[in-house]
């Protein structure tokens, strides 16, 4: 029995396009719609009865899924998504998951039952294979590069290389970095970049698994200062975490950058106030483009650039 992937292959289009045709989505070119309809006829495909019935109406709601609503990094992406959705007369709902797979499944079930028209995963715990099981019910966008679903992607490997190259150019030798999840996509890419350093500059003891908040940054600083051997530079996951490190180092008499240099990812208000060197990530644009991917059949997956901005912390 044919399925939605077979139709996509036969028609030479994406699974998302097939889903949009089945669900009478307006943002599909006539050429692609005809290809899909012909493929369905050739393969004798009968669309899922539930999906067809529910597609007669649109909720005009897009869900944005991420772990913590208090994190400025995610909120900046959300801001871009809300702005773009509003311009198309769509609404955004937030689904906070705390990296709980059951909560992510609930969001996908909302798509299946047509409570929402699409899902944007800023980050996720579920496997891509599990998420793909739901793509026939509507568009799903990820923020990591993959071979199965549309994505908006920042090359974390290249971003990390920019930070490392800058620190090496400033003659820092003992470079460390922080990650939130060892198995996360961004963490894996940064680890690959770190592994390109000369072997005598790689320090496993300077790779810190920590949180994302300002408070957790302070706690990490306290952990670091208990070590006998200290890094002379740190690349930090986000601005809030970096602000916590910076504040606690200052409290303990550790000078930035004289004793420890800091680089952060993001470029929000906290890094600007503290004059932190940053890898500027186009978070607002990520949110905007992810909504475009949900709504427009002509939009394609995209890699967005990062930029090094040097300030006084290195």
Task: Label every model-predicted segment.
Residues 1-60:
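N-terminal helix-turn-helix DNA-binding module of bacterial transcription factors
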Residues 2, 41-79, 88, 98, ...:
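N-terminal helix-turn-helix/winged-helix DNA-binding helices
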Residues 67-76, 94-102, 152-162, 177-222, ...:
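Hinge/beta->alpha junction and helix N-cap segments in small-molecule ligand-binding domains
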Residues 83-128:
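Central regulatory/effector-binding core of bacterial HTH transcription factors
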Residues 108, 116-122, 176-179, 207-208, ...:
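Periplasmic-binding protein-like
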Residues 121-161, 240, 266-276:
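Flexible loop/hinge segments that line or gate small-molecule binding clefts
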Residues 226-233, 237-314:
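Flexible loop/turn connectors
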